[in-house]
């Protein structure tokens, strides 16, 4: 479980760390830099996940601080991440965001473009794509979208799925090969 720590002060996060929570999610780069830069230097076990929309101009701040990106959704961003990783000599674990419901208001790679995008990211840009991420539509049967993500995971032979939010937790329990990462 990724503890979503966005908007919470360190005074509320520290008890989680003291009790063994190591994976934390942030969606605002500047807030994360201010909050986590010093504590991550002191505690190398902590893993920080970028769970929000990432703009290319923020990548230079994300690569040195974060360990995971859950929102890779376009080739320009992929190229910027690849370039910055070379500069910083660091390889993040990256999830491709899939627009599983084909919703115009949501970011993400369309299913029909996913295989080509994945291959470009892994073969040409040498990105470490560890999984797929989706935020399912609020309408319809969420489980069907999760099942479709499981099939996409198998087709691409990636390790992990990052799917859903706290309210999707029970549904994920009943999904075959459910999410490896859940934001709570």
Model regions and ranges:
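Single conserved hydrophobic/aromatic residue that forms the stacking wall/gate
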Residues: 174-184
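Conserved alpha/beta-domain cores
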Residues: 1-160, 165-167
């Amino acid at each position: 479980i990724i503890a979503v720590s966005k908007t919470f002060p360190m005074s509320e996060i520290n008890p989680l760390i003291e009790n063994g929570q190591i994976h934390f999610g942030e969606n605002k780069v500047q807030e994360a830099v201010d909050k986590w830069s010093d504590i991550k230097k002191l505690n190398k076990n902590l893993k920080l996940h970028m769970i929000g929309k990432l703009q290319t101009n923020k990548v230079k701040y994300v690569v040195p601080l974060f360990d995971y990106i859950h929102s890779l959704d376009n080739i320009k961003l992929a190229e910027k991440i690849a370039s910055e990783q070379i500069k910083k000599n660091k390889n993040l674990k990256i999830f491709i965001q899939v627009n599983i419901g084909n919703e115009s208001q949501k970011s993400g790679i369309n299913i029909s473009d996913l295989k080509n995008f994945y291959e470009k990211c892994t073969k040409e840009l040498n990105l470490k794509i560890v999984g797929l991420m989706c935020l399912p539509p609020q309408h319809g049967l969420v489980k069907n979208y999760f099942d479709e993500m499981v099939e996409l995971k198998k087709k691409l032979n990636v390790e992990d799925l990052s799917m859903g939010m706290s309210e999707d937790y029970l549904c994920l329990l009943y999904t075959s090969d459910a999410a490896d990462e859940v934001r709570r």
